[in-house]
């Protein structure tokens, strides 16, 4: 505890100030300690490094979409990762329109689900294209029919299968579609206050543009959060590349040995 001045000491200081022996400017304030506010409703569970690694994963995913989807849609597909951010699940769900197009994805062996949201205009364009049309979106929003959802389920299955490869450097996943929801109220996969990471991807299908949002709850990724850093991601990628290269060399050597062996009659 700081020392407390006696009355005599206070009187002496006042006298020195009044006579000019002391200058008030000589007394400087102690620098205030900077305090960083912490919002308990938005705990910082995703660092910038986590978000950057997720962007790298989905940049890889975007390249797979660009090269695989044209085979089904017979249209040029361009995919670009726009950004990533950490928000609460309620912020994500409250921003959803109705109807919406949500794929609830099981990320086995990780516990919990993720959500893939596809812009409805892209959904309508995909349906039109798969039914023989030119791939134009509807001018006015409406509910998806059961037949249309059945068609979109096949596309979601393709999208989800393509998730496997980009995640290999972090964890080997076996994702599958649990269900499609068109009402955001029925897609409450976690508590509204839980933190999630959202990766936003822009998709252009033959001139029709829309966003795809991937909602990744912290609770789903919790077991692999320590692996969501660029250093780990690139090191495992290099290890896998070296292993693949070694496998190719081994196969080539075995083939040469087999060829060089004399044929026995």
Regions inferred by a protein language model and the residue ranges of each:
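N-terminal auxiliary interaction/assembly segments of multi-subunit proteins
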Residues: 1-260, 264
